[in-house]
């Protein structure tokens, strides 16, 4: 339990920030799943478009430090490899 005004405020901020970060992580997972689904469908052009959109999302979330930049790079690399293998 927070005892000072500052600690109470930081606790409130932490709850709000946690909710926002959780939402952003969910957006990331949705973007990755969308690319995987497009790749499984077998349409390379559609998958490439979804991939470009998801790369933007992944980079934006990494820039905000919600995920580590290396994790973002790993996601992008694996999705790109899967897209390339679709040929």
From Swiss-Prot:
Keywords: Ribonucleoprotein, Ribosomal protein, RNA-binding, rRNA-binding. One of its GO terms (biological process) is translation. Residues 20-29 have a biased composition (Polar residues). GO terms for molecular function: small ribosomal subunit rRNA binding; structural constituent of ribosome. Residues 1-29 are annotated as: Disordered. It holds the Pfam family Ribosomal_S20p. GO terms for cellular component: cytosol; small ribosomal subunit. Belongs to the bacterial ribosomal protein bS20 family. Binds directly to 16S ribosomal RNA. This is Small ribosomal subunit protein bS20. It comes from Herminiimonas arsenicoxydans.
């Amino acid at each position: 339990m927070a005892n000072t005004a500052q600690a109470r405020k930081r606790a409130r901020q932490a709850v709000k920030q946690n909710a926002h970060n959780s939402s952003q992580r969910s957006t990331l997972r949705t973007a990755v799943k969308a690319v995987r689904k497009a790749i499984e469908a077998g349409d390379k052009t559609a998958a490439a478009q979804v991939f470009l959109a998801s790369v933007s999302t992944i980079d934006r979330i990494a820039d905000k430090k919600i995920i580590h930049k290396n994790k973002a790079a790993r996601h992008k690399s694996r999705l790109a490899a899967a897209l390339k293998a679709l040929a």
